[in-house]
Amino acid sequence: MNSLPAMKTVTLNNGVEMPILGFGVYQIPEDQTEQAVTDALAAGYRSLDTAAAYQNEESVGRAIRNSGIPRDELFVTTKLWVQDPGESNTKRAFEASLKRLGLDHVDLYLMHQPYGDYYSQWRAMQDLQAEGLVRAIGVSNFHTDRLMDLITHNDITPAVNQIETHPFYQRQADHDFMREHGVQHESWGPFAEGRNNLFSDPTLTSIATAHGKSVAQLVLRWLIQRDVVVIPKSVRPDRMAENLDVFDFELSAGEMALIAPMDTNASLFFDHRDPRMVSFLGQRRVD
C-alpha cells in the first residue's frame, strides 16, 4: 500500500533488521491461509509469522512464491515445537519446516515453548544460524528466569522473545529485562482475542476516538511506541489494511499513562509455569 508511511524496523542484537509490524497466521485454518497471506502481502505486509504447530506453513510458502515479491524484501518467521531430546531432532524439524515453506532460509527461527531439552534445541539452532539457514534465532513464551538461564549458558543470546502482551498483560518487567539484555520484545495476542471487552473499553475507545482511529489501531500504536514488535492477524483485507495504518499518529505521554493502569499483570490465556500446562504442551508432538 504505497500511501502508507514507510515501515519502521527494529535492529536485532546481531544486526538483522526486523519490521516492527508483521502479519501472523495463528488460528487461521490451512484452507484460508494462502488467501490470507496473499491479501496481506498485497496490502503491504512484508513480515510473516508462522509455526510448525500452526500446520499452515505450506500455505504460507505458496502465497510467498505466487506473490512475485523478491525474497530479500520479506521477513519470514517460523517456530520449532517441543522436540524429543537431541540436536538432530531439532535440525530435522527445521528442515521439515523449510521444505513446507519452500524456502532456502528463514529470517527468524523461534523456540516455541520453554520445555523439553531446550539446551539441545538451542545448540542446534545456533548451528543453523552459523550455517546461514537462519538469520536470527530466538524464543517464545520464556519467562525471565528461564531466559536468563539460556543467555548465561550459551554462546548466542536470543534475538527475540515472543510473549503474550496486550493492555491487560503489559509485561513491563519482562520488557525492561529484555531491553537490558538485548532481547527484542515481540507480542502475540495484541488484542487479547477481544477478552475483557477490549474493543469497547472506555479508556481505549476514548483515546482512539481522539485520534480518529479504531481501538485495534490504538493498541498496535501503543505497542509500537513501546518498541514492541507486533504481528496481528486477520482474514479480512479491510482489517489488514487498517492494522497497517498506524504510523501517522502518536500517543502522548499522558495517553500512554492512561493505558498503564489497565495491566492485570496476569495472562488471560494460560500460565506457562502451570504444571498442568507444562505437561500438556510438553507432551504434544508436531510432525
What are these regions (language model features)?
Residues 1-74, 191, 285-287:
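N-terminal binding-site loop/beta-alpha segment at the start of enzyme catalytic domains
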Residues 9, 113-287:
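Beta/alpha (TIM)-barrel catalytic core signal, keyed to glycine-rich beta->alpha loops juxtaposed to Asp/Glu
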Residues 28-31, 50-59, 83-88, 114-119, ...:
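Acidic-and-aromatic substrate-binding clefts and catalytic sites of carbohydrate-active enzymes
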Residues 39, 43, 100-101, 132, ...:
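Structural motif
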Residues 90-111, 127-131:
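CE4/NodB-like, metal-dependent polysaccharide N-deacetylase domain
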Residues 45, 103-106, 134, 158:
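A structural motif
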Residues 28-40, 86-101, 120, 145-147, ...:
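Short, acidic/polar
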Residues 71-84, 107-114, 141:
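A short, structured active-site edge motif that brings together acidic residues
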